[in-house]
Amino acid sequence: MSTTKAVIPGSFDPITYGHIDIIDRSADRFDELHICVLKNSGKSGTFSIEERIALIEESVKHLNNVTVHHFNGLLVDFCDKIGAETIIRGLRAVSDFEYELRLTSMNKKLNSNVETMYMMTSTNYSFISSSVVKEVAAYKANVSDFVPVHVEKALNEKFKK
């Protein structure tokens, strides 16, 4: 039987409980889960790629089948490189779907062997985004309900609480 591999891409700037929810649930469904940290050209990052990887690795250390990577290039090329045929994308609300559909259509056009699966974020986390968490943290407010302790500490350091 072949190994099932999936990729969860994202900027993870920083990782939140919403991301971790999708990662945990995906790790139960695939033999190997690869988190691919991508630089979003439309956003300036708060954390470096290396910092994001470290924060993610700490957040998923309880999962033996999860590996964290950085990749410059097309996501479908990363999938080819590691032999993954599934991309997993989390959806918080219907408003996420239009953007995700465009990405899925482009990825399918670039590589017809790669399928995208959507997973709804648990309702507890459906309002959380990295951008909102950073904005709240920048105002020195408590973000412990949205991110793990080590991420909260990193945010506090970035925004010098």
From Swiss-Prot:
GO terms for cellular component: cytoplasm. Its cofactor is Mg(2+). Keywords: ATP-binding, Coenzyme A biosynthesis, Cytoplasm, Magnesium, Nucleotide-binding, Nucleotidyltransferase, Transferase. It catalyses: (R)-4'-phosphopantetheine + ATP + H(+) = 3'-dephospho-CoA + diphosphate. Its EC number is 2.7.7.3. Belongs to the bacterial CoaD family. Homohexamer. Reversibly transfers an adenylyl group from ATP to 4'-phosphopantetheine, yielding dephospho-CoA (dPCoA) and pyrophosphate. This is Phosphopantetheine adenylyltransferase. It comes from Staphylococcus saprophyticus subsp. saprophyticus (strain ATCC 15305 / DSM 20229 / NCIMB 8711 / NCTC 7292 / S-41).
